[in-house]
Amino acid sequence: MGLPWYRVHTVVLNDPGRLLAVHIMHTALVAGWAGSMALYELAVFDPSDPVLDPMWRQGMFVIPFMTRLGITNSWGGWNITGGTITNPGLWSYEGVAGAHIVFSGLCFLAAIWHWVYWDLEIFCDERTGKPSLDLPKIFGIHLFLSGVACFGFGAFHVTGLYGPGIWVSDPYGLTGKVQPVNPAWGVEGFDPFVPGGIASHHIAAGTLGILAGLFHLSVRPPQRLYKGLRMGNIETVLSSSIAAVFFAAFVVAGTMWYGSATTPIELFGPTRYQWDQGYFQQEIYRRVSAGLAENQSLSEAWAKIPEKLAFYDYIGNNPAKGGLFRAGSMDNGDGIAVGWLGHPVFRNKEGRELFVRRMPTFFETFPVVLVDGDGIVRADVPFRRAESKYSVEQVGVTVEFYGGELNGVSYSDPATVKKYARRAQLGEIFELDRATLKSDGVFRSSPRGWFTFGHASFALLFFFGHIWHGARTLFRDVFAGIDPDLDAQVEFGAFQKLGDPTTKRQAV
């Protein structure tokens, strides 16, 4: 059958057995990819520094998804939070990867079996003797089973009743760990950053799915609705399934890019909005101010800032800084972070504290401007030295470090001051190892950026697929060349040339 590549799926159009076979094979491919990708990531993942070289800096994509569902241990003897373990148990990273690969193999065999034994009695309509599927009944079965799975996940896995719970952290991504979560049944459950909403929404949606499934199993659709929505046509199923998938893809693209309890920053990296709004910078200054209020020195207050919090406040971890088509992990861009140099405080010769204006997300280059507490420009690194009034040399800017590796060190040499002013544009200053991975110094995006781009792109593609297949199933007779105004009954698809009224018609 000489089908063009874009028509090959017609071979399973009226063949339920082989339609099932290709779907099982698709599941085998998806599960096989997931397991294989997990093993590859585990082979290249370095768990030694969860603070400065976490999974998202290393470009891990499937490990964060396993971790947020409660997997934290490896058969290699390490824990994702940096500790060592002696008994990781079956459900380790490798155990989950292996389970997916075994499941993939079983699905592969099942797909072959169903391809060979396609003509099963279960697919045969006893009234006509032809292959057919009771699509409304199948819809009810699937809705019921997915409802059971959804309810079970929310009521048992997430709550820890029978399962590990999920990854939960504080708003600044410092204390994350896997723990049971109680359902949030109040209005707080609608806050996307409240983990309890994950449990309550799965329980509620699962209950609704179970009830809806039972409804569709026990109640037949009205004839006019059945015909109007073409419920007997498998392409209707394809169209509505694509709609469900593209809607879900748009939703998760949003929760990933804007952040939510389902996408913790410890696993996927910070969001761009946290840089734009100075989210971590404000928390750092709040902690320093609290320390000063307790009569700590500036050095002592900055020394108590967690390195993890300081690292989030660095533009290289902003997922919007990496180009969409720059391949590789963040570590391949600006390098592997080795240590925090400390917080630079700039002062002019009058002793006034100056603040470097930070680079906005969508700039590659940005002028070095130092302002005082009132936002008035006091110093800069001029483009044209002949016209400069506020140069570091003229204003006499010095820099002193608090916290980090350079704690207590100060510089007055203009070249060194300008070097650190340029680096302060990018947030907190870190020592970065670019030699190990031959990093090129060009920022990369995090898995948060890749996931969002991929799902938004496929959602758009699938949206058009939904429109395409929905139109095909609703207007199938028109596309086949059958005029609805014809008096004579016409055998469906009997026109040799679509829409050609001169072709011989065959009465039914």
From Swiss-Prot:
Q: What is its main location?
A: plastid
Coiled-coil ranges from the UniProt annotation: none
Q: How is the cofactor bound?
A: Binds multiple chlorophylls. PSII binds additional chlorophylls, carotenoids and specific lipids.
Entry membrane topology: Multi-pass membrane protein
* SUPFAM superfamilies named among the record's database cross-references: Photosystem II antenna protein-like (SSF161077)
**GO biological process annotations for this chain's record?**
photosynthetic electron transport in photosystem II; photosystem II assembly
Q: Does the keyword Transmembrane apply?
A: yes
Which key words are in the record?
Answer: Chlorophyll, Chloroplast, Chromophore, Membrane, Photosynthesis, Photosystem II, Plastid, Thylakoid, Transmembrane, Transmembrane helix
Instruction: Quote the subunit structure annotation.
Output: PSII is composed of 1 copy each of membrane proteins PsbA, PsbB, PsbC, PsbD, PsbE, PsbF, PsbH, PsbI, PsbJ, PsbK, PsbL, PsbM, PsbT, PsbX, PsbY, PsbZ, Psb30/Ycf12, at least 3 peripheral proteins of the oxygen-evolving complex and a large number of cofactors. It forms dimeric complexes. Interacts with PAM68. Interacts with HHL1.
- Its transmembrane ranges are 21-36, 101-115, 140-156, 203-218, 237-252, 457-472
Q: What does this protein do?
A: One of the components of the core complex of photosystem II (PSII). It binds chlorophyll and helps catalyze the primary light-induced photochemical processes of PSII. PSII is a light-driven water:plastoquinone oxidoreductase, using light energy to abstract electrons from H(2)O, generating O(2) and a proton gradient subsequently used for ATP formation.
- This chain's protein is named Photosystem II CP47 reaction center protein
| Any one of the GO CC terms | plastid
InterPro entries listed in its UniProt record: PS_antenna-like (IPR000932), PS_II_antenna-like_sf (IPR036001), PSII_PsbB (IPR017486)
Mention one GO molecular function. chlorophyll binding
Q: Where in the cell is it found?
A: Plastid, Chloroplast thylakoid membrane
The record's annotation in Gene3D superfamilies points to: Photosystem II CP47 reaction center protein (3.10.680.10)
